[in-house]
Amino acid sequence: MNTPLRAGLIGLGMMGRHHARILSQLPGVQLVAAADSSGDPHHAAANIPVVANVEQLLAHRLDYCVVAVPTADHAQIGFALAAAGIPALIEKPLAPDLATARALAVAFDAAGLIAAVGHTERYNPALRALRARLADGALGTLYQISTRRQGPYPPRVRDVGVVFDLATHDLDVTTWVTGMPLVSLAARTVARSGRIAEDLVVILGELSDGTVTSHLVNWLSPLKERVTTATGANGCLAADTVHGDLTFYANGSAKTEWAAAEVFRGVTEGDITRYAIPKREPLLGEHEAFRDAILGKDAPIVTLWQAAATIAAAEAVLTSATTGGTAAPEQPRIPRPRLASDYALATTDPSSR
């Protein structure tokens, strides 16, 4: 019988409690201990030790660790884990700035360790289906990617604004589903809820092939909305990531005989199809992928370098909002995808750690 991977968790807050739930049930993994200086406010760490800090957590002979603390603390904990030889799954955003994100990526690379960032939307069934259909050419020439992500302010967020906390989802998803980088961004932000950081942003962008992107993100709306729409020559695909639904709106093939209406419509309404797709919890998919990567399997994790590119885009958004002009995201060096054999842990018996 294979020995389960020994996992640790740092942070037992609003997000950490969900990581604890998944880790406690994940096949092939044993959650052995958690760390949080505030204890376990949500009673998420049932029957495992809860220690105060990362140094005490390392005494539990971890095979990997999940980091679910405020963004400002990612660097200190990430560097400690890299120095200790512990692979890490770090919540998004990876870091509060590009320089720190790059430094974390370099640290884990230098140690030969697998590390990933929790861009959970990449595991949303609706977005995975959208990406696959775009790759198959379902829309023909792609014209636009647009997203809407709005809802009430989440009390869990205290150290970053809406750009780093929420818009990073949309910036990452846009480049991931299309396979193209953002090359230009223009944005406007406002702060209306009494916080120093921005709580609403509107972003207009351009991908490397000229595809237009647009993103509406805020913490000010009582309407919770999570929608990604791709529009192309053949129609549009709309992903509702709250419910995991993907709908195709086809351009109609019937000719419009009413000349006056044809002038204004451009395309006609065709068939509407809502696809039946398997719906699995995105966070579970994220953990399964990281577990499999630790075990040396080919798994779709979000690398630290990929996450750093998203940080670069978020910084460009804030630069544009400050200057009133457009900004080009700095493109971090993204190494080739590494093979499992490149990582020290892939050839190490986890039980020996």
Predicted regions and their residues:
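A contiguous active-site-proximal alpha/beta segment in oxidoreductase catalytic domains
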Residues: 95-157
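Rossmann-like dinucleotide-binding domain that binds NAD(P)(H)
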Residues: 154-212, 216-223, 229, 305
